[in-house]
Amino acid sequence: MRRARTAFTYEQLVALENKFKTSRYLSVVERLNLAIQLQLSETQVKIWFQNRRTKWKKHNPGQDANTPQTPPSSDETQIQPILPANPITSFSSLLLPPIISPANSAVLQGTSIPLTLFNLNQILMPQNVGFN
């Protein structure tokens, strides 16, 4: 059975397009952070970027997909690093959205599974969100 087509909101599309303008390929951490920020699964973000790169290549034959569309201007804000200084102690709190903040993380307390990128996404992003 085919999966229902994802209907992205205007805000999600704007954020995805803006990220695509700066980088056509996302790292695992960038993809996870963007997915959490937009309340999408990592797979949805990954597939959107794959489809968008295909569209870009079709409209820009012969150009390198690894280079940004436009060089950042001096008045644009610089992207700050997203990794904390000590990833072991503060990485999990960096990725937690407001709905599961350290003060609100009773659901995660007492779990014996380490909070990895994979299971954090499974906890935060139910697979059938928005599909009826």
Swiss-Prot record:
SMART domains: HOX. InterPro entries: HD (IPR001356), HD_metazoa (IPR020479), Homeobox_CS (IPR017970), Homeobox_NK-like (IPR050394), Homeodomain-like_sf (IPR009057). This is Homeobox protein ceh-1. One of its GO terms (molecular function) is DNA binding. Residues 1-60 bind DNA. The gene is ceh-1. Keywords: Developmental protein, DNA-binding, Homeobox, Nucleus. PANTHER family: HOMEOBOX PROTEIN NKX (PTHR24340), HOMEOBOX PROTEIN SLOU (PTHR24340:SF37). Its main location: nucleus. Residues 63-80 have a biased composition (Polar residues). The keyword Nuclease does not apply. Residues 56-80 are annotated as: Disordered.
